[in-house]
């Protein structure tokens, strides 16, 4: 690999890394949104169940002559009203499936970045193996990938990500080396007749 190709290769490595980060951050943000969506759905279900339960208990308490305690008969409707207000608040606060839609946007954007990441990885492999050695061809392919990357960002707004997603992505990319395939994984997954290890 000549010096000119090394410089281009370095630029491609940097773009690969940027796409890997964007891909994983978007995936992590999607996971965060889905967890929040499930949490909110569970809260709304709990609020509805408790509201219904206290309403039923209130009706039973009024009908059963054994309960003479006026304090209990007064407190149960107050609890029911409070739970009903909480349930209503949750319904208005967490609009219908907003977080689920945000998660879908993050996943869709991550998929585009993953595709681009794979293309960069293939180009890097072809250059390193010597399949592509001509600097002009490498520059042309680099520019095509840059155009694809620009188009991804031009087609839609980049979905919002949080610091929490960045931290989670950092641990996945740098801590567990999720973007690397180990020899053990290759031996376990790739059919024997296709392995070169």
Role assignments for model-derived ranges:
Residues 45-49, 77-79:
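Hydrophobic H-region at the start of alpha-helical membrane spans
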Residues 29, 56-60, 89:
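Alpha-helical transmembrane segments of multipass membrane proteins
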Residues 50-69:
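Juxtamembrane "helix exit" motif at the C-terminal ends of alpha-helical transmembrane segments
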Residues 64-82:
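Hydrophobic alpha-helical transmembrane segments
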Residues 1-46, 72, 90, 94-197:
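Conserved non-transmembrane functional hotspots
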Residues 49-53, 82-85:
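Hydrophobic alpha-helical cores of multi-pass transmembrane domains in eukaryotic membrane proteins
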Residues 76-96:
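Transmembrane alpha-helices and immediately adjacent membrane-cytoplasm interface residues
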């Amino acid at each position: 690999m000549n010096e000119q190709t090394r410089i281009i290769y370095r630029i491609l490595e940097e773009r690969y890394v940027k796409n890997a980060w964007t891909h994983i951050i978007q995936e992590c943000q999607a996971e965060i949104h889905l967890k929040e969506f499930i949490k909110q759905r569970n809260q709304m279900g709990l609020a509805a169940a408790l509201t219904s339960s206290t309403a039923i208990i209130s009706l039973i308490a009024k009908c059963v002559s054994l309960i003479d305690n006026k304090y209990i008969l007064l407190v149960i409707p107050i609890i029911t009203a409070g739970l009903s207000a909480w349930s209503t608040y949750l319904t208005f606060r967490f609009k219908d499936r907003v977080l689920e839609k945000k998660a879908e946007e993050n996943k869709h954007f991550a998929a585009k970045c993953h595709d681009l990441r794979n293309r960069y990885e293939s180009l890097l492999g072809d250059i390193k193996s010597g399949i592509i050695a001509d600097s002009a061809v490498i520059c042309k392919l680099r520019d095509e990938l840059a155009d694809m990357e620009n188009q991804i960002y031009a087609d839609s707004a980049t979905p919002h990500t949080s610091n929490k997603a960045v931290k989670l992505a950092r641990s996945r990319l740098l801590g567990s080396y999720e973007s690397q395939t180990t020899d053990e994984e290759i031996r376990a997954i790739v059919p024997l007749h296709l392995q070169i290890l």
